[in-house]
């Protein structure tokens, strides 16, 4: 079988770079963070420029963490400055290096998601100048995989030179620089980009390109820590592995030889993927990904509330989310027969002494290691495939009431529609056989079913009318009464993309 060559490209601090370019600033020399300051200092930073990261700031931290770290760095600069005094400030890395008397400053840019998507489309069109769409996997708004095996001979270029040519074209077209990884499979090119490229010096344009093959992976990364640096190894996986004496990919590879059963006990069938990656293997190709069709589908959304909500207010927000989910189903011509809801509780339930006394349930740790009440999770079967607003909202309310702890403050909500299928392929409600009996009034039941079907058809016409108006005038062109109640979030979220300002 022909050895394949893959390139992964990641646009460097993409959102932050776009904001710098639009301000006429150099993304490699400007301290800038993309965050919605109007949401308070606890808001998540979507991107941080490389110069600001050099002060030990995480690319996905909270805004208050950025401010705190800059404050600490300025305290250090003041201590080292002549006369222990800072005079003025600058957000430019080059100026800060030249003048130790300047305080570190930075720009806070509110996110503009629609604009970033437009930029991403322009960059994707640059990729299409070199590689056909069937050989590109769009992994995220700022990251792609390319199978360039059949292009190297055409362009008479090495993988490194082709990657550089594409990246420089993106830089010339948009002013955005990038990092690339080259590998003999998708896993290796991703790891080369995520891990190896970070440890090599950038060129004058800020470009880093790293390469890996299977043997290079084993020689260079079998001892790499932490495990969470590797693609698809999250905190949960790493914790389980460390509890069983495995701290590196080399440890996992050795365990797969000596005690493979242990890995399958820990991770089930997912152990096969972990073992492959530990050896630097990845059989999946771009072609296989393009051809994949999942056997089951779901559609869902999640929301982190700006402040802790009571159960009553959270129920309103969940109903709004269910209503939005229904309109997505209708627009795509889909139906569902099952809803899943997850309710995440706020840390204040345990930090407030009065609330803490009332709670006697399970306690877990959140992403930051803080103690919070265990989330509530439940499923509601609808009895038929449907996209009816009434049926789904009623089921959502019933499920919420059944699983929620009414005494706790709520911070997160998730809802998903499971077993989603095309409306045309959905089984009819009366298609199943049933045993007749003497005690059922079938005439009355048939009349009731006909009325229900007529009501659903009338509702469907209204849904389509609403969709038509919203497509033309925007999602807020038609709102429901619940969208105007105190605590409702749908109106604001309709003006967002991915939970951030459009």
Where does each model-flagged region fall?
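Gly/Gly-Pro- and Ser/Thr-rich, intrinsically disordered tail segments characteristic of DNA damage-repair
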Residues: 1-277, 282-286, 443-502
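Short, charged/polar surface micro-motifs in flexible loops or helix N-caps
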Residues: 12-14, 38-42, 345-350, 420-424
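Acidic, metal-coordinating catalytic segment for phosphate/diphosphate chemistry
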Residues: 18, 369-502
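DNA-contacting surface of Y-family translesion DNA polymerases
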Residues: 8, 229, 237-410, 425, ...
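Contiguous hydrophobic segments
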Residues: 71-80, 311-322, 326, 408, ...
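Generic "edge-of-domain/loop-turn" microfeature
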Residues: 39, 153, 187, 304, ...
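Residues at or immediately flanking beta-strands
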Residues: 177-179, 340, 414
């Amino acid at each position: 079988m022909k050895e394949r060559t893959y390139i992964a490209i990641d646009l460097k601090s993409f959102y932050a770079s776009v904001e710098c370019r639009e301000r006429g600033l150099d993304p490699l020399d400007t301290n800038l963070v993309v965050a919605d300051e109007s949401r308070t200092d606890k808001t998540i930073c979507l991107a941080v420029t490389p110069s600001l990261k050099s002060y030990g700031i995480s690319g996905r931290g909270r805004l208050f963490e950025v401010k705190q770290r800059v404050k600490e760095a300025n305290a250090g600069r003041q201590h080292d400055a002549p006369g222990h005094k800072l005079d003025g400030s600058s957000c430019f890395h080059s100026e800060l290096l030249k003048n130790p008397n300047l305080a570190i400053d930075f720009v806070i840019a509110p996110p503009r998601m629609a604009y970033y998507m437009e930029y991403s489309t322009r960059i994707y069109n640059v990729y299409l100048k070199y590689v056909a769409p069937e050989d590109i996997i769009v992994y995220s708004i700022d990251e792609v995989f390319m199978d360039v095996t059949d292009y190297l001979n055409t362009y008479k270029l090495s993988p490194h030179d082709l990657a550089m040519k594409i990246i420089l074209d993106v830089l010339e077209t948009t002013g955005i620089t990038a990092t690339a990884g080259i590998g003999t499979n998708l896993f290796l090119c991703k790891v080369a980009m995520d891990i190896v490229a970070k440890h090599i010096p950038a060129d004058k344009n800020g470009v880093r390109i790293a390469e890996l093959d299977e043997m290079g992976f084993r020689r260079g990364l079998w001892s790499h820590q932490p495990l969470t640096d590797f693609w698809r190894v999250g905190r949960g996986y790493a914790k389980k592995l460390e509890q069983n004496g495995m701290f590196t990919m080399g440890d996992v590879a050795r365990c797969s030889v000596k005690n493979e059963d242990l890995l399958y006990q820990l991770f089930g069938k997912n152990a096969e993927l972990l073992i492959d990656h530990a050896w630097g293997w990845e059989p999946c190709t771009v072609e296989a990904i393009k051809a994949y069709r999942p056997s089951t589908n779901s559609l869902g959304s999640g929301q982190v509330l700006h402040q802790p909500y009571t159960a009553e207010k959270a129920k309103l927000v969940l109903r709004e989310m269910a209503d939005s989910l229904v309109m997505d189903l209708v627009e795509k011509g889909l139906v569902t027969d099952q809803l899943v809801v997850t309710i995440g509780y706020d840390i204040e339930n345990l930090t407030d002494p009065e609330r803490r006394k009332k709670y006697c349930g399970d306690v877990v740790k959140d992403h930051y290691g803080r103690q919070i009440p265990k989330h509530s999770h439940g499923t509601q079967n609808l009895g038929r495939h449907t996209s009816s607003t009434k049926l789904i909202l009623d089921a959502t309310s019933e499920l919420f009431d059944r699983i929620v702890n009414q005494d706790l403050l709520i911070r997160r909500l998730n809802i998903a529609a499971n077993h989603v299928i095309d409306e045309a392929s959905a089984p009819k409600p009366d298609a199943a056989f049933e045993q007749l009996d003497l005690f059922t009034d079938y005439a009355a039941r048939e009349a009731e079913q006909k009325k229900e079907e007529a009501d659903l058809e009338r509702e469907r016409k209204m849904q389509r009318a609403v969709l038509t108006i919203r497509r033309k005038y925007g999602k807020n062109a038609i709102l429901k009464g619940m969208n105007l109640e105190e605590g409702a979030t749908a109106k604001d979220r309709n003006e967002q993309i991915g939970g951030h300002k459009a």
